[in-house]
Amino acid sequence: DHFIFGGCRDWRKPIKILVAGGGTGDALIMIAQLLKNRAVPAEIHYIDPAKASRKIAEDRAHFRGLDHINFHTTSLENAADFGPFDYIDCCGVLHHLPDPEYGFRALSNALAPSGGMGLMVYAPYGRRGVYELQNAFSALVADLSPREKVVVAKKVLRNLPKTAALASNPWVADHKNGDAGLYDLLLHSRDQPFTVERIRDALAQADLRLAGWVEPGRYDPKLLINDQSVSQRVDHLSYWKRAALAEQLAGNIKTHRFYAVLNANTFAPPVFCPESVPVIHNAPADKLAKSIAQTGKLSFTVNGLTFSHKLDRASADLVRHMTGKMTAGEIVAKANLNWEFGLKRLSGLSLYLGNFNHLRFSRFFADQDQTV
């Protein structure tokens, strides 16, 4: 809602959704259950080429009584056959395709003119060490069965040289969480990671544009450069160059999570107005408000990097009411502030909280419980 519909979608209206590369159904079930809880008239489609994964997803849907899902055993390259879609969810899939850029184009062709998609692709720098070992294991265990590959890989990892890049990468631990995680990370057919600039090019080739990063603060190099004289040198760079610089400086981005819309889509990011409905995301609003009141700041730690921002008590009073149940105008009135002063506070909060995936605009939960 926030990234594609500006936080203003009327959820009483029908919506058509595709989960592309749905696997065993994690994203599918979450989306379908939320829409069912909200009584949204939804038509949901699932696409995945693996019959075994589809069976698991179907069983999960049946268990929850989610009967508004259409299952298709096919590639996402055929997505347009079932569209057009108002929203496409595709997480952790495109980088596994032989031609990921073609996958971008296939999904773009399946979008409705006013629709958009949520995407996740692997990033290279935060996954340092993964690709070296993928190459190493490809040479070492290519002739073995999957089970034998895991046995050999475990032996290698137990004695992995401390100089290996993966040994010093604290952000990647999939290989420590069971055989499935190990196989998917290091023994799976090699994935193709995306830098910021490769994402830029893939979107352009698919007639798409970026609607927003899930955590835009991680793509702002000025938040990583504390020296003002150096920080000013960022100003002459293009948006994409700045984002690429931040990715390179931080070195800890494992995945890129973002939303995209068609170039012709006139969508604009939501801003505070009296009718907008802000909702704190990824943390209880009252907990964040209490932290602000006690410390006079908000701090977020993301993969080893801590970002802090000073705030005052007035901000705490505003955050406390950002539950998705009240409009911005109602929140400002509840905090006993005039609109001009409240708007200034809200705009500052929106920038900082939004930078780290903690504030969204949406009417989805206005009259509903937020749990799945």
Segments (PLM) and residue ranges:
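Class I SAM-dependent methyltransferase SAM/SAH-binding core
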Residues: 18, 25-78
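Conserved alpha-helix/loop element of class I SAM-dependent methyltransferases that forms part
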Residues: 1-15, 30, 34
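A short SAM/SAH-binding and catalytic strip from SAM-dependent methyltransferases
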Residues: 86-100
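Short alpha-helix
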Residues: 191-210
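A short glycine-rich, Lys/Arg-flanked "PGG" loop and its adjoining helix->strand segment in the class I
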Residues: 101-113
